[in-house]
Amino acid sequence: MGSNLPAQPNLRLTIIAADGLYKRDVFRFPDPFAVATVGGEQTHTTSVIKKTLNPYWNEMFDLRVNEDSILAIQIFDQKKFKKKDQGFLGVINVRIGDVIDLQMGGDEMLTRDLKKSNDNLVVHGKLIINLSTNLSTPNTNQANGLHRSHVQSSTSSGLVPQVAPSSSHPAASGAAPVDPSASNPSLNPQRVPSTTRPSSTAAPASAAGAAASNTHGSRTNLSSFEDSQGRLPAGWERREDNLGRTYYVDHNTRTTTWTRPSSNYNEHAQRSQREANMQLERRAHQSRMLPEDRTGANSPNLPESSQQAHTPPAGGSANAVSMMATGATTAGTGELPPGWEQRTTPEGRPYFVDHNTRTTTWVDPRRQQYIRMYGQNANGTNTTIQQQPVSQLGPLPSGWEMRLTNTARVYFVDHNTKTTTWDDPRLPSSLDQGVPQYKRDFRRKLIYFRSQPALRIMSGQCHVKVRRNNIFEDSYAEIMRQSASDLKKRLMIKFDGEDGLDYGGLSREFFFLLSHEMFNPFYCLFEYSAHDNYTLQINPHSGVNPEHLNYFKFIGRVVGLAIFHRRFLDSFFIGAFYKMMLRKKVSLQDMEGVDEDLHRNLTWTLDNDIEGVLELTFSVDDEKFGERRTIDLKPGGRDIPVTNENKAEYVELVTEWKIVKRVEEQFNAFMSGFNELIPADLVNVFDERELELLIGGIADIDVDDWKKHTDYRGYQESDEVIQNFWKVVRSWDAEQKSRLLQFTTGTSRIPVNGFKDLQGSDGPRRFTIEKSGDPAALPKSHTCFNRLDLPPYKSYETLEHKMSIAVEETLGFGQE
């Protein structure tokens, strides 16, 4: 074949890039280079690109070919080139006559899928090359002294390609570096392809952009305002997160979406689609609920904490499980039981001492008093669960006291937390019926937490005025200009251009809107976790904004402010974030929500023999704004190999670096703002799960619980309008129920223990439906008082129609 070849080169090959190569090692990225061969006689080798699945070479080679020549381009991993499989990463074969006419001349850009070798090793990805008969321009490889040519019969005879300048130390990282385009200050990033997964699901790499727009091999990246489907609509930008997932930024509305805007872009249609997508995301978010946490209606109705221990609980218990004390059944006369003594307080109140147990009680042991507990059977009717005399229950726990109301109803005082409750602490079964242990513990922790002096609202008012369409910036200016002590005063929110007094509803709306805005990935402060696309984690590259630490302090203040004023944020974080807030040590299990691939790889490392399999050191690779650097996990870590003996330490250090160290500055700024309102020693009473509930409330809507804890004014529960109302609510999906709740209470969140703990402007306030308004009018809400003014609609269809319009179309919150 060589005799048929021209004497001089007649074709220029430009090996531009590869995209989405297969990652064979658990941790290490390959060091790819390409070898081009024509007929087994002409061989050319590119330079080595270190540690990447998306190498960019853009190197030119002049070839002597004819129409029947076969051009073979193979890709290898330089670190494994001397091993049996030579680190093979894929090959393409091109017959020259099939793609270009040498006589007529031409210029062809090719993107070919990489193929397997005879060894059938798994390969993946694409190779982008350019073939041109125009050799008039200088060969830049030759000009730079990078041209390598070998005349030999095989490509496996010990090629030693030139290595591009880079760190030669092996490093471990189970995740690709974060794409700097996700946080480019110009909001016009040039995409650097990067992925952690064997298969690339992202849009074509920047090299592909070069392939599509340059016929001479000069590097021209695919702009962030276009992708493989063409140019994005005006104001849209394509970005990629640190996990290689492509998302789109709408600068017109400052929102992000996973869905590519259609080519026939319509602002109204896109707005509707964005709203629909937001509700779908909200619906998925609201479905996050612990499987066993569906008995909120059955948990006892403990009163709010009292600042004075002697104040008895007020009001009755309307719970499915309740405790009731009967009056005396026998006369309090005769001799006291053995070991008992009656004494009198200085105020003249009698009490009784049991010398057998060294305890005291207000209850006369001669008056046989029974504690009955009621629960609901499968039919929903009350049945007695337990009945036993008080005298058989034993002593109260340390610091507890039993007292009686004026109506002889027993209540209990916990002097440890200065709180009161109807529940006898000696009767855990009164709480156990269908109520998870963690919920009982959380409720008592919450009572203690809120009773502390540091959590008491100070005298005075804290006024915050914001614009709905500029809530992030306005809130930042308002909250950061005030001292922590001012923020502890009664919060008074004012929306610009809207009339109304804040009795609680406006502040709930404020936190709902602000949480959606400040956690938006558009601002590059937070990003979606690896576990899903709604839980959040700190963006390690938030430093693109020079003021990012001030913003994190602001966000910490907002979270603390919400907890302090008993409001909820409509956001959830990865589990590790809550652990970090509690200063707990993160574990490998926490890695799953941060980087699923790395979690799987680290787990494999712990469970398998890695000697001779993995070439790891106590270091990791990190990329920041295009600069790749090697970070030691311990002093001199890049020179310390990982063995079976020290791999547990390695896994621990990688986990700590990935979750904690990378965002340490941002997190410390967040906590500095948070602790200005919530002392660290107080929040530490909760565990990470409880802290999540404390910040976000529960994320599901139990209609039965809602109905159970609803009051009526002008209506009765049996009225047809009320029956139709609940029928409509049950027929609605989760998103519509959430919007109804937001319409009526100012937030889509409900308290941890269900609707019985719903808060109003003056403390606990049940949801109320009032008969008010003309049947031709829409329902009206009073979010400060959790009240819905519902006109007496004549039919189910009318009620459903009017409710839908009111809930879906209402934006402002006009309060009385």
UniProtKB/Swiss-Prot annotation:
GO terms for cellular component: cellular bud tip; cytosolic ribosome; endosome membrane; Golgi apparatus; nucleus; RSP5-BUL ubiquitin ligase complex; ubiquitin ligase complex. Residues 181-192, 214-227, 254-267, 296-310 have a biased composition (Polar residues). Residues 1-112 form the C2 domain. The keyword Cytoplasm applies. Pathway: Protein modification; protein ubiquitination. GO terms for molecular function: phosphatidylinositol binding; ubiquitin binding; ubiquitin-protein transferase activity; ubiquitin-ubiquitin ligase activity. Residues 134-238, 254-354 are annotated as: Disordered. One of its GO terms (biological process) is cellular response to L-arginine. Its EC number is 2.3.2.26. Residues 160-178, 193-213, 325-334 have a biased composition (Low complexity). It is found in: Cytoplasm. PROSITE patterns: C2, HECT, WW_DOMAIN_1, WW_DOMAIN_2. Keywords: Cytoplasm, Repeat, Transferase, Ubl conjugation pathway. Residues 230-263, 334-367, 394-427 form the WW domain. The active site is at C784. Residues 483-816 form the HECT domain. InterPro entries: C2_dom, C2_domain_sf, E3_ub_ligase_SMURF1, E3_ubiq-protein_ligase, HECT_dom, Hect_E3_ubiquitin_ligase, WW_dom, WW_dom_sf. It catalyses: S-ubiquitinyl-[E2 ubiquitin-conjugating enzyme]-L-cysteine + [acceptor protein]-L-lysine = [E2 ubiquitin-conjugating enzyme]-L-cysteine + N(6)-ubiquitinyl-[acceptor protein]-L-lysine. Belongs to the RSP5/NEDD4 family. E3 ubiquitin-protein ligase which accepts ubiquitin from an E2 ubiquitin-conjugating enzyme in the form of a thioester and then directly transfers the ubiquitin to targeted substrates. Probably involved in the regulatory network controlling carbon source utilization. Interacts with creD. This is Probable E3 ubiquitin-protein ligase hulA. It comes from Neosartorya fischeri (strain ATCC 1020 / DSM 3700 / CBS 544.65 / FGSC A1164 / JCM 1740 / NRRL 181 / WB 181).
